[in-house]
Amino acid sequence: LWLRPTEKFDFQDVIMRSEPASKKVSGILVPLFALRGARDFGVGDTEAMRDLIDWSASHNIGLIQLLPLNETGSDHSPYNAISSVALEPLTIALNACDVPGLTESDIAEEQRHFGWPFRRCNRVAYEVVKPFKRAVLRRAFTRFKTDAQDEATTAEFEGWIARESEWLTAYVRFRAIMELSQGDERWSLWPMEFQTLKGFDRYFEGLAQDEKFGWMAEWEFLSWVQWVAHRQWARVRAYADGKGVSLMGDIPFGVNYYSADVFECPDRFDLTWSGGAPPEPAFQDDVFVKRWGQNWGVPLYDDAFQESEDFAWWRRRVRKNREIFHSFRMDHILGIYRIYGFPWRPEMNSRFASASDEAVQSECGGRLPRFHPRPDDTDSEKQLNREHGERFLRVLLEESGKGGLVGEDLGTVPDYVRPSLLSHGVPGFRIPYWELEWDTRLTPADAYDECGVATYATHDHDPLRVMWDRWMATIAKGESGLHADAEARDRAWWEVRRLANWAGFEVPCIKPFEDVHLLLVRALLRLPCRVVIFMITDLFGTAQRFNVPGAVADSNWSARIETPVSEWDRDPSLKAFLSEVHHDLARVHARSSGR
């Protein structure tokens, strides 16, 4: 049933139904920062990624989905990058083979200087790991420049700078000003002449030659870091190709307000609105999110400007992503049809969390959060929004190729979005407990479309174990005799039995997660969807959560998997569990094939 990595499958052929109907792809979603390599320095890197590719290939997992890899600033969310193209330097593996000019003494000296137990931390200590890696890379760059390099390596670096100038020029200027501003990417706080690329270029032209040399030296270092990062990821792509493992990337709908992209060309964006998502039943833990929704802080796009340049910025963004990944997930693809906007920046969220509509309007020029370019209140508005999205969708498909695009179509989904995506051959995501019938039953497994990606969770959701344990605890507490506890218990039983009925098993009494874990995994794998992806925590049955929407906490985007990837198979219980999963799949395939 499952395509094995050794079969050299093509994800695009599977999702576009070019492969035989029985063929499917199983995958895992892992935040790179969470991986532990045998020799990482406090954050997952390209070496850990190679280990993951090896592990996946050995377990017949044909697809690895990652979160965005673009460079972040003071906010470490991979969905709030400071560049739509530049890669996060933290992903660079510090070894002499992959970093020209680097020596072991460089690493050792900086380790002594920082004095930090990089490999023993259970979270990514960005406040230490970022400056540590930056310091090591500066040492390596200095040696790269001063020591004799072979001509081929030097030519490779210089050629790369020339080829990437379209985005690199603005990025290195933006990033150099950030360094001058103690790492603060908020260009609105920079001197006026530094706030846009055009303004900075005018400032630069007026400098004395020695002052220009200082800037140019920093630009070269920043270019070199990006060259090293792109070089390493190109090798990861080649390594994955050799192992037959497909890589799925992630392109967020928006970019950071304080990004090199806005700095380069603010006219591409509508900076008066802040993109996000409306309130959803799934996210009720945060007062602001419950009241207003999620304010991501990303600027909206100026549609007229984007169309005037034939979506050149978007085309570049997709092309660069596809240099590393075989396919990509378009985060919040609903946004290409219509996007929810806030008339204030996220810094103001606490101010408006409990405010009335009238109070907000009085401070925001009569504006309230709303959909752009228009709501879906009438059939004609829905049709216009669908046409708006499909113009955008055609551009994405032109650049991504067949099967290269997967749409994250979760949340409050307009009724025209999924038919629109399917009509263009774009699969969306299917989370079983969000796929509901009119009577609140979970949609039966046989009603799922083949052109879909099935999963239990994204990086924003509770792992299966957390959800199950919470239900069981609520049920146990329901025997306290309190009316409220009894009501909560009955609701929890309803949730448990609804999911269990969908998955094909019974829960007559309280059961530990270990008793149902394999049953839930099997249920997802048996869906008709051509692609099935497990969050790594759901496959392993662990409780880590990587992000809580709306929360601002060190725990977001920082949790690390306890064991290095190279040691996962030393866990006998995990190894036995995975063996059972694949043994079960073989039996399913035999039945479905009539053998």
Where do the model's predicted regions map?
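Short acidic catalytic loops
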Residues: 61-68, 240, 246-252, 321-336
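Structured C-terminal cap/extension of enzyme domains
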Residues: 541-595
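Active-site pocket-lining segments that scaffold enzyme catalytic pockets across diverse folds
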Residues: 229-242, 246
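Mature N-terminal, pre-catalytic/accessory segment of carbohydrate-active enzymes
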Residues: 9-60
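Catalytic domains of carbohydrate-active enzymes, especially glycoside hydrolases
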Residues: 21, 48-72, 324-325, 524
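Alpha-amylase-like alpha-glycosidases and glucanotransferases acting on alpha-linked glucans and related
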Residues: 17-24, 29, 38, 75-230, ...
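Gly/Pro-rich turn-and-neighbor structural signature
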Residues: 233-234, 247-252, 257
